[in-house]
UniProtKB/Swiss-Prot annotation:
Gene3D superfamilies named among the record's database cross-references: 3.30.70.20
Cofactor stoichiometry and binding remark: Binds 2 [4Fe-4S] clusters. Cluster 2 is most probably the spectroscopically characterized electron acceptor FA and cluster 1 is most probably FB.
Protein name: Photosystem I iron-sulfur center
Domain 4Fe-4S ferredoxin-type: 2-31, 37-68
Organism: Picosynechococcus sp. (strain ATCC 27264 / PCC 7002 / PR-6) (Agmenellum quadruplicatum)
E.C. number: 1.97.1.12
Alphabetical list of PROSITE patterns matching this protein: 4FE4S_FER_1, 4FE4S_FER_2
Lineage: Bacteria, Bacillati, Cyanobacteriota, Cyanophyceae, Oscillatoriophycideae
Gene: psaC
Role noted for this protein: Apoprotein for the two 4Fe-4S centers FA and FB of photosystem I (PSI); essential for photochemical activity. FB is the terminal electron acceptor of PSI, donating electrons to ferredoxin. The C-terminus interacts with PsaA/B/D and helps assemble the protein into the PSI complex. Required for binding of PsaD and PsaE to PSI. PSI is a plastocyanin/cytochrome c6-ferredoxin oxidoreductase, converting photonic excitation into a charge separation, which transfers an electron from the donor P700 chlorophyll pair to the spectroscopically characterized acceptors A0, A1, FX, FA and FB in turn. Mutant proteins with a 3Fe-4S center are not observed bound to PSI in vitro, and are probably not able to do so in vivo.
Entry annotated with the keyword Methyltransferase: no
Gene Ontology CC, one term: photosystem I
Amino acid sequence: MSHSVKIYDTCIGCTQCVRACPLDVLEMVPWDGCKAGQIASSPRTEDCVGCKRCETACPTDFLSIRVYLGAETTRSMGLAY
């Protein structure tokens, strides 16, 4: 079972989710769509255990962890699939 980290458009670039993740699933990437100039991205979704610490840490309810069967992992925001 893998977990998909859905990233929505309310990221403020605070890095709280990145620091909260115990498995280093998230990272910040450059993005012009927010004031901070960076946005959370999830390049290592195969390592996500669904603990939801990133969701809890997020001050804007930006992240959502959803459980999928198989290798159905995605990154939203059009950054990659």
